[in-house]
C-alpha cells in the first residue's frame, strides 16, 4: 500500500522560487530600513549606519575585510524605486521561466550571476561599491531570451507580448542607466547576463549546474517543512 506524502513545500507552494527571491530582497530592504530608523531615533549619524551596517553588505575594493559581501551585495538595495524596478523585471522574466518549467533554475541563475559579477567587479576594481539585484536580474532576463524568446505574455491582450520585446526594452533601459555607472559595474552586469546565457546553453546540453542546489533545497525541505 502506498503512503501519502504529507510533506509541504518549505515556502508553501511548489513554484516558490520566485516568491523566495522576492521575499529575500524585500525583507532585506525592510530590515535595513528599520535599522536605519533606529539609528535616526537614537540621533546617530546616518554615516555611521552606512559604515557599520550597509557598506559591509555591499561589494567594494575592501571586500577582503567583508568576504560575505560576495554573497550579499546582490540582495541589498538603498532606494525604493531601484528595488521596485528590479523586482518588477525579476517577476516578469522569472514568471516566463516558471511557465516553461524552469522554476528550479531561477535561484541557480541568480546565484551564479552574482558570483561571476562579483569576480569581474573585483578584477576590474572600483572605488564605488556594487550592490542591488541588477546583475542577477540581467541574468534572468538573458536566460529567458536564450530559452524562450518567442514565448508570449498577456496572450489575451492583442495576441500577447513576446518575451524578446520585453527583453529588448529591459536591455535598452539597463544600457541607459549603465552609461552613468563605472566600468566595473558595467562589466559585472555584462558578466551577469553572460552567466544566464551560459547556464541555459549548458542546460540545453543536459548539464545542470544547479543540481547541487536542487538537492540541497530538497534536503532542507525534507528536514524543515511542516508535516500534516
Regions found by a protein language model. Name each.
Residues 1-16, 26, 174-228:
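C-terminal transmembrane module of polytopic alpha-helical membrane proteins
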Residues 4-8, 90-98, 149-156:
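C-terminal ends of transmembrane helices
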Residues 14-130, 178-188, 201:
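N-terminal TM1-TM2 helical hairpin plus the immediately adjacent luminal interfacial "cap"
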Residues 84, 133-141, 187-194:
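Membrane-embedded alpha-helical segments of multi-pass membrane proteins
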Residues 99, 147-160, 205-210:
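Alpha-helical transmembrane bundle and helix-membrane interface signal
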Residues 104-112, 132-137, 157-167:
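Cytoplasmic-side transmembrane-helix entry/capping segments in multi-pass membrane proteins
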Residues 127-149, 163:
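Membrane-interface micro-motifs in multi-pass membrane enzymes
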Residues 163-178:
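Hydrophobic membrane-spanning alpha-helices of multi-pass integral membrane proteins
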